Amino acid sequence: MLSQIQRFGGAMFTPVLLFPFAGIVVGIAIMLRNPMFVGEALTAPDSLFAQIVHIIEEGGWTVFRNMPLIFAVGLPIGLAKQAQGRACLAVLVSFLTWNYFINAMGMTWGHFFGVDFSAEPTAGSGLTMIAGIKTLDTSIIGAIVISGLVTALHNRYFDKPLPVFLGIFQGSSFVVIVAFLAMIPCAWLTLLGWPKVQLGIESLQAFLRSAGALGVWVYIFLERILIPTGLHHFVYGPFIFGPAVVEGGLQVYWAEHLQAFSQSTEPLKTLFPEGGFALHGNSKVFGSVGIALALYFTAAPENRVKVAGLLIPATLTAMLVGITEPLEFTFLFISPLLFAVHAVLAATMATVMYICGVVGNFGGGLLDQFLPQNWIPMFHHHASMMFIQIGIGLCFTALYFVVFRTLILRLNLKTPGREESEIKLYSKADYQAARGKTTAAAAPETRLGQAAGFLQALGGADNIESINNCATRLRIALVDMAKTQSDDVFKALGAHGVVRRGNGIQVIVGLHVPQVRDQLENLMKDSLSTEHTTMTEAVS
């Protein structure tokens, strides 16, 4: 059950990866429309510069204005066991069908459900527009539920054989037919139950606003501590992209109000108190540096060059784009205690910042959120808040360094560089020498690359049931865990870490994990095709 939840959480990250670039475009465009940055002349409505900026900004809003649709279409990429493209098409058609059913039922029987479909779909009305359809505002929750349901139907019925005379309805068409019938009761139940859910969401929003600093600490702590399980997606998702604290999610709300916030002289915490729930990126920007410095200075002097080669790219990835797993997994499996301390420090840093008036959209890294969506557009009227944030962040960088260094030395933790064999885990040549591999045996891995090495380490194509990925991890369901090789082999091939649970394995690869997954799937297809050809030749 847990592996299925983790798989679902990982699939949610596929559409999430579209937001950083969109956020950068919107943030820069709003900054260029601000007369305090570019002058009154360039921001005049009849200015060619202003018109071009407006056109570009509208393109940047694509992802934000179509979040439910994007989440619905994006999930099957990670959840469908085969023919992911066809699954996405089936989900798209079914999701639109569901919304059309909601619209028709609401317009016809709105009085029965207690929903006024004649109202304009404005904020607070409970209604919204999706692909030109007036429907209930179920945010990304409805999209995720419907997408998951239709993908399950795809996994079950895509291969179902039909009689020859019904062959035209086989495959995706049959999935859409089954889903069409399923969407009728789904729409009915949505109209019946969602208005009550909306009341519950409003109560949750009020509670979280009143929770203040305590709510921020608990939220940030859970978001960090659950990273090894992959369940952290279910913590931040409802806040950043869903309606947990504001309608439409913190990401969209901040982008929509960025212009007004940047031109207001009121404190940002007064304007946007909910912004405390989007401070989890501070541990990525400031905490990562302290962790990396502690790991470097506790390594043996003769190993520090090698350790630096491991830590510098991982730390830059965390700081610039907010992906922390390559760094965190260098010490997570060596000492879970360090990771727990990391979660406590991250939550405490965000809480201290919030108490001192720091709010905003700081969930990512410097390049995607800190600079374009916060510091640059807010500098004119809110520079003091930024200096407070940076000051607190640097203090916590030092605190991270002291705490991690003390724990590593006092507990004699074998972090990278404190034991010779640990460094060799990150060097393929060293590992092969230690294992006594011959050059001939190692050559295929070198030739076929990392994916081929992972395939062998996983026990071959026959030992893999399904492959999925999130931002940095391969998530693989296996036939037999005993056929896999040791974690050392995966690390020698470039993995940052390995998580094993039952017959499921997670290989922490890095930001190039989508390419590795595609290569793995192609290698598996080639392997199965070769086996089929061999069997055919044997029979003939």
UniProtKB/Swiss-Prot annotation:
Protein's recorded name: PTS system alpha-glucoside-specific EIICB component
S-S pairs: none
Active site, UniProt feature: C470
UniProt xrefs under NCBIfam families: EIIB_glc, pts-Glc, PTS-IIBC-alpha
The UniProt record lists the keyword Transcription regulation: no
Enzyme class: transferase
Annotated PTS EIIC type-1 domain residues: 1-420
Pfam families found in the cross-reference section: PTS_EIIB (PF00367), PTS_EIIC (PF02378)
Protein location: Cell membrane
Spans through the membrane: 12-32, 87-107, 130-150, 174-194, 201-221, 225-245, 277-297, 307-327, 329-349, 352-372, 384-404
